[in-house]
Each structure stands twice: as structure tokens, then as C-alpha cells.
């Protein structure tokens, strides 16, 4: 790609869908290393961003993963979820396409609108998470309950992965809200770890070893 772009004058820019550039990842994911540890990567990310840091030292602990595993109380009422309104411009076209081209497939088309389809609805979804689910996100980060689809989970991954929200935007909103509302540190650190830690770490692995991963059954 780089050699071709130099011939036809294409400017190659970094994707805003990730916090790290490909160049940022080169040093950590050096081929000379035998193993890569997410914890080491995450600590580097915290130092680089300054999130939950005082100088080179973390505020509290590096990770509150051991405080992200509470069982959801039996009689606890889950937070209110505000689902996005249907965007008829996109939805009707999508329904028509699926019914036309996949009408003989198994199952049926679910027309419920569960995910945002534009920036405004994605932003509203993020705001609803901040206001309703963020405060106890850390306690119930790993919780599941039969019959409940969301609980305190953010469901921000599809919005970031599809480009409706950038990780930089989400992290800035998280930082601002957590500071204003005194969000518990296990909730704050828990979701920051997912975005600047795990997501960027897996991308770095794929960036450097995609061919090996695709051609093997390592995972």
C-alpha cells in the first residue's frame, strides 16, 4: 500500500477509529519479543494518556479487575435503557434490501431498533450510559442475568467499531463525566481499560500478526 501510494500520490492517513497509530505500536509489538502482555501494554497506555495518573504513578491501583466481578443482586432493578428511535431513511432501505436479497434465508427480520445508526443517536446512547449505567459499571462489568440483555454494560463497542463514535471522543466524554460526578474508580478504570487497553492491544496484535492469526488456530 505504501509503495503504491508513493507512485500515484495517495496520502495515507491513520484511522480515527483507534487511539494508537500503527507507528505507536511498532516498538511494543517488536518481533524480537517472544510474548506480549496486555498488562504491560495497558500501563504504557496509561502513562502515555495520563488518564488516572499522577506523574508516572497510577491513582490507586493499575487495575481494578478484581472489583469488576460482583454478582447481580436477585431483586435489583436494572437501569433504564433508552433505545434509539428508528431512522426511517436508513432502516426502510435496509429492510427492503434484506427482504429482497435474503428472503429465503432462515429466520425472520427483526425490525426493532436496538442500535444507533447515526452520530446523534450514538451520542445519545453514550449519554444514557453515562447517566444510568456508568456509576455501577465497575461492580457489574462481568455480570449476566437470564432475560436481561444489557444490565450495566455500555454496548459502545459496535458504535466505536462502526465509526459512529471515535474512541478519542468516548474517552474524553468518560473522563469529563467521571470527574464531574465522582464516578467510582472501579467503574472509571474498568471501562478505560477496555478502550485504551484491550481494544488497542488486540488491534496491535492483529496489525503485526494478522497473516499468522488468519492462517492458524491460535485463539
Language-model regions: role of each:
Residues 1-118:
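Beta-rich, aromatic/charged-enriched effector core domains that present basic-aromatic interfaces
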Amino acid at each position: 500500500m505504501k509503495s503504491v501510494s508513493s507512485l500515484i500520490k495517495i496520502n495515507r492517513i491513520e484511522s480515527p477509529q483507534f487511539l494508537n497509530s500503527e507507528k505507536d505500536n511498532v516498538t511494543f509489538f517488536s518481533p524480537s519479543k517472544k510474548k506480549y502482555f496486555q498488562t504491560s501494554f495497558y500501563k504504557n497506555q496509561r502513562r502515555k494518556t495520563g488518564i488516572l495518573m499522577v506523574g508516572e504513578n497510577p491513582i490507586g491501583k493499575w487495575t481494578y479487575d478484581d472489583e469488576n466481578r460482583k454478582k447481580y443482586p436477585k431483586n435489583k432493578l436494572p437501569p433504564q435503557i433508552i433505545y434509539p428511535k428508528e431512522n426511517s431513511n436508513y432502516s426502510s432501505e435496509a429492510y427492503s434490501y434484506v427482504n429482497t436479497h435474503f428472503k429465503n434465508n432462515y429466520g425472520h427480520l427483526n425490525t426493532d431498533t436496538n442500535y444507533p445508526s447515526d452520530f446523534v443517536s450514538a451520542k445519545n446512547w453514550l449519554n444514557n450510559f453515562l447517566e444510568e449505567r456508568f456509576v455501577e459499571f465497575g461492580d457489574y462489568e462481568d455480570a449476566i442475568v437470564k432475560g436481561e440483555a444489557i444490565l450495566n454494560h455500555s454496548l459502545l463497542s459496535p458504535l466505536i467499531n462502526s465509526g459512529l463514535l471515535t474512541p478519542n471522543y468516548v474517552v474524553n466524554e468518560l473522563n469529563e463525566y467521571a470527574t464531574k460526578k465522582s464516578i467510582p474508580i472501579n467503574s472509571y478504570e474498568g471501562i478505560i481499560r477496555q478502550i485504551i487497553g484491550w481494544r488497542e492491544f488486540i488491534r496491535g496484535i492483529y496489525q503485526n500478526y494478522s497473516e499468522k492469526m488468519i492462517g492458524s488456530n491460535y485463539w
